[in-house]
Amino acid sequence: MKAIIIGDIVGKPGRSVLSETLKRLKDRYEAEFVVANAENAAAGAGVIPRVGEEILSAGVDVMTSGNHIYDKKEVIQYIEKEPRLLRPANYAPETPGRGLWLGSTDSGTPVAVINLQGRIFMPPSDCQFRTADRLISEIGARASVIIVDHHAEATSEKYALGRYLDGRVSVVVGTHTHVQTADEQVLPGGTAYISDLGMTGPHNSIIGVESSLVINRFLRGMPTRFETATGDARLNGIVVEVDERTGKAVSIERLQVKSASS
């Protein structure tokens, strides 16, 4: 099976380019499953119900997230009732939502999606390595195709988890930095890996934010209200092919698609 995995959707520009391009990409690659990180989808920080539904309607099957998941209070009730929106599984058990989705594609291929968060230069959370162990054991034979979104800052930490899970999951992707890396590969054990998917949003910006606002904060050191940039919207991500019988990745390809209106 082929899956498309999409980097952090940032604000309205990100949602617009997603809606514009995803169906075409699914047709081109014959992809039957789509995962997208949605933690910046509502005005650049967080998710609200209307935005979540917009992303699902565009053709996304599962939404992952990270440290901005609770930036909008409206998400609390939504994440409790919408199993297709994940929060990091290594958050405290009492935290609203869940970090594992287990289901199947339209053709019946069982798929699991795990959402994890890094701990280096990030808010406190439980160990993502041990959390992954527990969830893989919980999934067991119910799904051979397992996709992991590791929302983390440090590349070394991302690589470490990729190597740690090599051969036990199908795909490990990094998110969070909004900068697409060029290290896509199939690891020796058969796990597809990339350090960061990049950003689906306005690339005429500083990682999605209006450039002048970020520069002003660096120059003056004063608090500045960030606003999502506009223009040059692009979709970043990967398309990965997985042998659904073995759960091993066959190939991984980077995606960077510009909006026709940019």
PLM region spans:
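Acidic, metal/ion-coordinating pockets
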Residues: M1-S262
